[in-house]
Amino acid sequence: MPKSRLLALAFCLWAQLSIHAEALDPAIQAKVDAQMTAIQAWANDPVLVKAVKEHNAALPPDQAAMTQEKWKTLTVLDPFVRGFNKNEAGQFLKSKKTEVISEAFLSGADGLKVAFLAKTTNWSHKGKPKHDEPMSGKTWQGPVEVDESTGLQQLQIAVPVIEGGKPAGSLVVGLSVSKLK
């Protein structure tokens, strides 16, 4: 590998680590913490709990057959995609949207989508901290980054959806960094 490419790669890796290591200003972190509290209340709402419970009990065949490759080919106008923001849980998320919230999506225990504000980049988030941490009963806060699906500089927070005293799914919400300031 040429030295210039190696240096460029090293710089990119350093920049990524710097972004992830950067702590938020305490005033901004306080706003993120307040959003986390609000989102935990959403995750306990009967509409979201019911949607996750139903998803976990019986995954529809069209959802079971969905793959990441196929998901990427679907447009936001596809009836399959629209079903996730038009269902009752999707409408609940829409009712909670503010200028600070850039995205929100609800996943079942399997990491597959139950509802969202807008089509997500990935069909499943299983195996990623934003889903796995809430599934262990913890909240999660990601780094500030440019989100693939929204194109905005945001950070994501995630909370468990509790059903029967146990984590049954996850609720991930993207917060617009510029609107938190």
Give the ranges of each region predicted by the language model:
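Bacterial N-terminal signal peptides
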Residues: A8-S18
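Structural recognition of the beta-strand scaffold that forms the well-ordered cores
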Residues: F105, S170-V172
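Extracytoplasmic/periplasmic ligand-binding sensor regions of membrane-associated signaling proteins
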Residues: F116-A168
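Proline-rich, low-complexity intrinsically disordered regions
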Residues: K3, S18-I19
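Extracytoplasmic/periplasmic sensory segments of membrane signal-transduction proteins
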Residues: P26-T121
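Helix-start (N-cap) segments at beta->loop->alpha junctions
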Residues: V173-K181
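Boundary of Sec targeting at the N-terminus
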Residues: A21-L24
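Bacterial N-terminal signal peptides that target proteins for export
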Residues: M1-A8
